[in-house]
Amino acid sequence: IPEDAWVLSPNAFDQPKPAARHTVSFTRGIPTALDGKAMDPVTLIETLEAVGGPYGIGRGIHVGDTVLGTKGRVAFEAPAADILLTAHRELEKLVLSGPQQRIKDQVATQYGDFVHEGKQLDPVCRDIEALLTSAQQRVTGDVKIVLRPGNLFIEGVISPHSLLAATKGVYGEKAGEWTPADALGYSRILSLPGILQTRAGGKK
C-alpha cells in the first residue's frame, strides 16, 4: 500500500520521535479519562486517534475470512482501539482471576463473530453481554502507556482492586502466603495424576 494512502499515520516511521507518555483511566471497564482529564468516550477516542496516529500505533494490514467464506485483505488504522484494548487487557490481568480472564476472552471472541455475521439480535448476545458486564465490575484503575514509533508499551497499572497488591508476596521474587512445606505438598498433589499414570504403566 502506498504511504500516502495512510490517513492517520502518514510517514509515521520516517523520522525518530521522542517517547510520549500518557495515562488512560478506566471505570468498570469503560475508558473515562486521559492524563487525568475526564472525557466522554467519543472525545477520548478522538483524542487517542490524534495521539497515537503519528506513532503508527494500530496500523497494519489484515487478511481474513468474510461471511461468504472468501478471503479479504484490508489496510487499517486504529490507534485508539489499539491503545484502549491493550491498556484494558493489562488492567484486567491485574484485577480479574485467571478463570475470569479465560472465560471472558472465549465469549468475547464468539461475541465478535456473532456481530460480524449480523447475529447481534440473537438472545445469546444478551447473555454474553451480561457476563461481560459482570466481569467489568472491578476493572477500574489507571494504565500508564509509552508510545514510540510502531510500539505501544505498558509502563504500569494501578487499581484499588489489584489482586497483586492483595497478596503478601511479590510475583517471581518471594512468597508470603505459603511456606516451603505448603509448596511441597501442593506440588505433590498437582503431580499426583502423572505419578499414578506412570505407576500404572509399570514405569518408575
Where are these regions (language model features)?
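Nucleotide-activated chemistry modules centered on ATP-dependent adenylation/adenylyltransferase
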Residues: 1-204
